[in-house]
A protein has these predicted regions:
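Generic recognition of stable, solvent-exposed alpha-helical segments in well-folded globular domains
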Residues: 2, 6-10, 14, 35-39, ...
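N-terminal glycine-rich flavin-associated loop
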Residues: 85-112, 136-139, 148-151, 157
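Short acidic, glycine/serine/threonine-rich loops at helix termini
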Residues: 99, 137-143, 173-176, 207-209, ...
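A short core secondary-structure module
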Residues: 158-210
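Glycine- and acidic
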Residues: 1, 22-26, 54-58, 95, ...
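A short, Trp-centered hydrophobic/proline-enriched beta-strand micro-motif
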Residues: 121-132
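Glycine-rich beta->alpha junctions and the first turn(s) of the following alpha-helix
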Residues: 210-278
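Amphipathic, small/basic residue-rich leader segments at the start of a protein or domain
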Residues: 1-89, 108-119
Length: 278
């Protein structure tokens, strides 16, 4: 396919020029997100790497399944630096819950804003927050302590939710404008778990958290964020129904994660292979 060939060539060019120069100049010597690392994102945008995940009607250019293209993007970047590949895949992962299970309104709103040059000249970037801190363990994707509860629900109006979430090893947090976060119910008026979208401008605390010190992947941004925010219930990924006065998300966080990871296994596997081979 011509579109796949072109994105592979463009990615290879970025990897062996922009990313290779960063590695040679010692960009991996710091865990902090720097101006030089930020320029890598702009190179991704210019090469079409950022838009490769989107549908054509959202500003993308690859029709149909994109697993092969995304896997090859990860492979080309990881051949030079695993952190660069992680940054690219994490941006896709932030949008994946919306792409797989989001409402049409959510897809249109967030996907179009992440395609360069964004909306009204402002481009958004996202992060995916699943893992949480566990004392003496690190993380466990099977444990979910983030909570949502209802703080305001006036008759005839949309409920306002309080989101409490602490993240661990969350990629892209230095520059994320929004986060898709996994949370569980902390209120008897909300049934089960879900994924919810939080934005930097929401009321409350959007703390990007402490920088994570890593042995590898220093060209990616990793932090341990803390969120305590009020958001409208329409941010629940996939929407919700009200049954007997209870908010019932249409998709649990487990269902969304299963749908997302089913599509990301191939890109991650190929990226890992490139890191080992290089």
């Amino acid at each position: 396919r011509y579109d796949t060939q072109m994105i592979v060539q463009a990615t290879r060019s970025v990897a062996r020029s922009t990313v290779a120069r960063m590695v040679a100049n010692g960009a991996r010597n710091t865990h902090e997100w720097t101006t030089e690392k930020d320029d890598m994102l702009k190179a991704f945008d210019a090469a079409g790497i950022t838009a490769a995940f989107m549908e054509p009607e959202q500003g993308g250019f690859i029709e149909g399944p994109k697993n092969l293209a995304l896997a090859l993007i990860g492979f080309e970047l990881a051949w030079v630096d695993g952190g660069a590949a992680t940054t690219s895949l994490a941006s896709d992962l932030a949008l994946a819950p919306i792409h797989e299970r989001g409402t049409e309104e959510q897809k249109q709103y967030y996907m179009t804003r992440c395609v360069p040059p964004g909306v009204d000249g402002v481009q958004w970037r996202g992060a995916f927050a699943l893992t949480e801190p566990l004392p003496y363990v690190g993380v466990d994707t099977g444990v979910l302590s983030g909570k949502i509860s209802i703080v305001e629900w006036e008759e005839g109006k949309e409920p306002i939710l309080q989101v409490e979430k602490r993240g661990r090893f969350i990629t892209n947090m230095d520059f994320a404008d929004f986060v898709t976060a996994a949370v569980d119910s902390g209120d008897e008026r909300i049934k089960g778990s879900c994924m919810i979208i939080i934005e930097e401008g929401d009321e409350g605390q959007f703390d990007r958290g402490a920088v994570t010190h890593k042995l590898v992947h220093q060209l990616s941004s990793t932090r341990d964020p803390i969120f305590s925010l009020k958001v409208p219930a329409s941010r629940i990924v996939g929407g919700y129904d009200v049954v007997d006065g209870v908010i019932v998300p249409r998709h649990s966080h487990g269902q969304i994660i299963e749908a997302v990871f089913r599509r990301t296994r191939v890109p991650v596997a190929l990226m890992s292979s490139a890191k080992l081979l290089s």
